[in-house]
């Protein structure tokens, strides 16, 4: 992990397309601005982790669920 020190109003760049600016500091809270290309998605860490977990749960399909869906699809439910 690269660790940098920035003051309010100072920025850093990630590649050519991403700019992160420290907008202000109040106590233990830092307000940052992030400039990214319009096609790039930016998530807060807690939101990103929730999205990943929900996607993982959506992919967890049991064999019984697949068998039931197959029977329904083919019209052979009992």
Swiss-Prot record:
Superkingdom as given in the UniProt entry: Bacteria
Intrachain disulfide bonds: none
Molecular function terms from GO: mRNA 5'-UTR binding
InterPro entries: CsrA, CsrA_sf
Record's subcellular location: Cytoplasm
Pfam families xrefs: CsrA (PF02599)
Keywords tagged on the record: Bacterial flagellum biogenesis, Cytoplasm, Repressor, RNA-binding, Translation regulation
GO biological process: bacterial-type flagellum organization; mRNA catabolic process; negative regulation of translational initiation; regulation of bacterial-type flagellum assembly; regulation of carbohydrate metabolic process
Main location: cytoplasm
UniProt cross-references to SUPFAM superfamilies, sorted A to Z: CsrA-like (SSF117130)
GO CC annotations on file: cytosol
Family statement: Belongs to the CsrA/RsmA family.
Function: A translational regulator that binds mRNA to regulate translation initiation and/or mRNA stability. Usually binds in the 5'-UTR at or near the Shine-Dalgarno sequence preventing ribosome-binding, thus repressing translation. Its main target seems to be the major flagellin gene, while its function is anatagonized by FliW.
Record note on quaternary structure: Homodimer; the beta-strands of each monomer intercalate to form a hydrophobic core, while the alpha-helices form wings that extend away from the core.
Protein name, entry field: Translational regulator CsrA
